[in-house]
Curated annotation (Swiss-Prot):
Transmembrane regions: 44-63, 83-103, 110-134, 188-216, 236-256, 275-299, 353-374, 395-418, 423-446, 559-581, 591-616, 651-668
GO biological process, one term: sodium-independent organic anion transport
Protein name from the UniProt record: Solute carrier organic anion transporter family member 1C1
Record-annotated disulphide pairs: 480-510, 486-506, 495-527
UniProt keyword Transmembrane present: yes
Cell compartment(s), UniProt: Cell membrane
Purpose of the protein: Mediates the Na(+)-independent high affinity transport of thyroid hormones at the plasma membrane of brain capillary endothelial cells. The transport activity of substrates L-thyroxine (T4) and 3,3',5'-triiodo-L-thyronine (reverse T3, rT3) is much greater than that of 3,3',5-triiodo-L-thyronine (T3). The prehormone, T4, is the major form in the circulating blood and is converted to the active form, T3, by the iodothyronine-deiodinase in peripheral organs. T3 plays an essential role in brain development via binding to specific nuclear receptors (thyroid hormone receptor).
Keywords: Cell membrane, Disulfide bond, Glycoprotein, Ion transport, Lipid transport, Membrane, Transmembrane, Transmembrane helix, Transport
Amino acid sequence: MDTSSKENAHLFHKNSAQPAGGPSFKAGYPSTEEARPCCGKLKVFLGALSFVYFAKALTEGYLKSTITQIERRFDIPSSLVGIIDGSFEIGNLLVITFVSYFGAKLHRPKIIGAGCLVMGFGTMLIAVPQFFMEKYSYEKYERYSPSSNLTPNISPCYLESSSPSPRSIVGKSQNKINDECEVDTSSSMWVYVFLGNLLRGLGETPIQPLGIAYLDDFASEDNAAFYIGCVQTVAIIGPIFGFLLGSLCAKLYVDIGFVNLDHITITPKDPQWVGAWWLGYLIAGFLSLLAAVPFWCLPKTLPRSQSREDSGSSSEKSKFITDDPVNYQMAPREESMKIMEMARDFLPSLKSLFRNPVYILYLCASTVQFNSLFGMVTYKPKYIEQQYGQSSSKANFVIGLINIPAVALGIFSGGIVMKKFRLGICEATKLYLGSSVFGYLLFLSLFALGCENSSVAGLTVSYQGTKPVSYHERALFSDCNSRCKCSDSKWEPMCGDNGITYASACLAGCQSSSRSGKNIIFSNCTCVGFAAPKSGNWSGMMGRCQKDNGCSQMFLYFLVISVITSYTLSLGGIPGYILLLRCIQPQLKSFALGIYTLAVRVLAGIPAPVYFGVLIDTSCLKWGFKKCGSRGSCRLYDSHAFRHIYLGLTTLLGTVSVFLSTAVLLVLKKKYVSKRSSFITAREKIVMSSSVKKETCAARDHGLQPKYWPGKETRL
């Protein structure tokens, strides 16, 4: 070929790959030759989507790790904390349907980038109350503070002979309450946390439906499951860092940098300790803002893989976007016509989804299972703290370092299994169902791995320390502290030398106190001697008694079973997601994912933390009270009731989801069997028709003379 012909060929190739005016001779997406330089953009999108998944998952994990910190800082019950946690789902609910449906027809990467900006600002808004609230004030005797120049022999017990009359005490207390109520302006600052989490939910909305559908559209069928598995795995790595960040911040005092830490008398092991919960939200918000940058540089569409083009599977965008890529820049009139066309097709598309029995059953199964998982994950740190006596920092640390990696490994393993064995939709459903069955069977064993209640005088054991106390026998007053003028609303736990915790040193009947560093020692405690009369040491120390060594052993067993259960349940994550993508029409993919996300948010994400929190609150033994006398957060839980509510509700919901998943498999098998039988019947008819035609043609050709068909004697 000469030079001029080469130039003409090059010019023809250039013009055909990048048409200037007329329609391309290749319909649909850019040609393969043009696609090769741009194929790396799919990997860029994969990396950007993975990072934003990491950022949003880190924030979500950090939020779960600060549940107890927020509860104590704002002095609110678990049910209200559940509402704050569910505000994220409420934000999703407001826009998920429109974003998933209309967003699929617009510039998906830029919509995701805008969502990241909103999510980042919302995350930072959560931390704002810390800078406007008063300094954290935990329940304590002011004269026991190191800054109050404590002198020895001050009696926590106001003896009846030397104390003012009960009427004067009540009057002074009421006046103090009224004064504090006037200056307590931070009682409702939790609303900003609610609004920030709501805004975070709004920004997160387009990431999952648009991002996953974008990947599935432009990746090959073999790589789609693997790419989604990579994204989901990175999303699970996010909570690891979220919980570890929560563990680090929980060790720092809430007002660090604003107060003298030498004056703080409590430690991270104290039930009243509040860590620097606000610090992690500033870090997570910055990461979300940073994650928005790459999406503004990515194109609206990418070249499709050759396998997808050969298979003829239609993109979700092919229904409303023209085949010529040059025509993506539409005039305003054409753009408005497109939007009207999409709006008219909304209800038919919705009806098509709800007429799909596999989609509806899987939607119900996933919703019930996510109720189980949302409730379990939200209150898992609190469960570890209350059941096994661990600090908030340690609870977050073990979840982030042990549990979350098991979930990540399970999700990644599910993607590898799907890719390695090329599982079909029925096999994927079986793997999804099997992982759920074995996971919840393992979860049942956690019922046997509980600890006994802490020995708290008047609440879990009698003041004699010899027998448990029933619900009707609970009373913080006894003969041993009858001469003291104590408040039963205070929670200033003191650990006696007899191993029993008392609600306060006053209720323990202590008549003197002294300080050793930050520790406060109480002496001559009549109730301590009442439970151990033979012991000559009737003293105690500020703080709650630690649980016995047997509970530490149970905690190790709990971690082992919890890790195995987490891996088993997460193994079915990717197969279940592939089932969701393959049981619907390709052009409805983003819309179906949006409806799926909407249902999970509305029916699981919002209510699950709330009703889990309400039921957990019923196991509270000792409530705290705010300055104005209203009920605050729970100070002490009944370990047995907490365990049965937390584990029982999770198992019940998981069992229901297993039955619904079984129905999905049965309907799917029936649907495929009927389709296969109809396909075989149609194929047999075609084969029989072809054989008849061949015989007829052979008979006709046999009667023709060869001269009319020169060279065709052997035809047919």
